[in-house]
Design a protein with these regions (language model features):
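Nucleotide-sugar donor phosphate/pyrophosphate-binding loop at the beta->alpha transition
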Residues: 118-120, 129-149, 159, 186
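Structural alpha-helical scaffold elements that stabilize or flank donor/cofactor-binding regions
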Residues: 87-89, 149-150
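Donor nucleotide-sugar binding/catalytic pocket of nucleotide-sugar-dependent glycosyltransferases
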Residues: 44, 60, 144-191
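Helix C-cap/helix->beta junction micro-motif
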Residues: 36, 91, 111-115
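A short, charged, and often flexible helix/loop element on the N-terminal side
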Residues: 56-86
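Alpha-helix capping/helix-boundary segments
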Residues: 48, 103-104, 163-165
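N-terminal subdomain of nucleotide-sugar transferases
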Residues: 1-62
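An aromatic- and histidine-rich active-site surface loop
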Residues: 96-123, 128
Length: 191
C-alpha cells in the first residue's frame, strides 16, 4: 500500500480548540500525511474560537464541558452519533487512528472493528495519573484496567518515548508498542 492509498480517520479529544503538545503533534502529523498524498479526516470537538486553525478537514464530535474543576477549557467528546457514522461511511477510511481513550475513542474503536478496519492508538499522556491531582488516587487501578482493556483491543499502539513504552508494557497495555518520536522543530530550536 502506498501512502496515497491511506484514508485515515483520526479521532482526537482536543485537536485545536486548546493548544497543547499532543494536538500540536497531531496537526503536524496530519499536515505531513496530507503533503504526501494521504487522505485524512479528523473527528474532534469544535468550538467557536479555537486556539489555532486546524490542519485538514475537521468534523465536530458531540461533546460536553470537561466535568473536572479548573479544566473548563477542555471538552469531553461523548461518542460518535449518527451524523459522524454517516460521515465515516462516506469517507471510507482504511485505518482509524485514536489519540485519546475517551468515549469517542471507544466508539471509534467499536465502529472500526465492526467494519474490519485496523485501529492505531497513540498515547500522548499518562491518563491513569490524573486522579492523583484531584485527591482521588484510589481510582488509578481502575483507570489502568480501563486503559488496558481499550489499548489491547487496538491493532497497534505507539508512544512518544522509550520510557513511556516501558511504562505501558509494564502495565500490560499492549504486547507490541512502537516508538513515535516527535522530533524537534528546527524553525524554533536552532543553533
Amino acid at each position: 500500500m502506498q501512502i496515497s492509498d491511506l484514508r485515515i480517520a483520526l479521532f482526537s479529544g482536543n485537536y485545536n480548540y486548546t493548544r497543547d503538545g499532543a494536538n500540536q503533534a497531531l496537526n503536524r502529523l496530519v499536515g505531513s500525511l496530507l503533503a504526501k498524498g494521504a487522505k485524512v479526516r479528523v473527528y474532534s470537538p469544535k468550538v467557536a474560537n479555537p486556539d489555532f486553525e486546524a490542519t485538514g478537514d475537521l468534523v465536530g464530535l458531540p461533546n460536553v464541558p470537561m466535568p473536572v474543576k479548573g479544566r473548563g477549557e477542555y471538552r469531553l467528546p461523548t461518542g460518535i452519533g449518527a451524523a459522524v457514522k454517516r460521515d465515516l461511511e462516506a469517507f471510507q477510511p482504511n485505518i482509524v487512528h485514536v489519540s485519546s481513550p475517551d468515549p469517542s475513542g471507544h466508539a471509534a474503536l467499536r465502529w472500526a472493528q465492526d467494519h474490519n478496519i485496523p485501529v492505531l492508538a497513540s498515547v500522548h499522556t499518562r491518563f491513569e495519573t490524573y486522579p492523583r491531582y484531584y485527591n482521588m488516587a484510589f481510582l488509578e487501578p481502575l483507570i489502568i484496567r480501563l486503559l488496558r482493556r481499550f489499548y489491547t483491543r487496538c491493532d497497534a499502539l505507539v508512544a512518544p518515548s522509550q520510557s513511556m513504552i516501558d511504562e505501558l508494557l509494564a502495565m500490560g497495555m499492549h504486547a507490541d508498542i512502537g516508538l513515535w518520536s516527535r522530533g524537534v522543530d528546527r524553525t524554533i530550536f536552532s543553533s
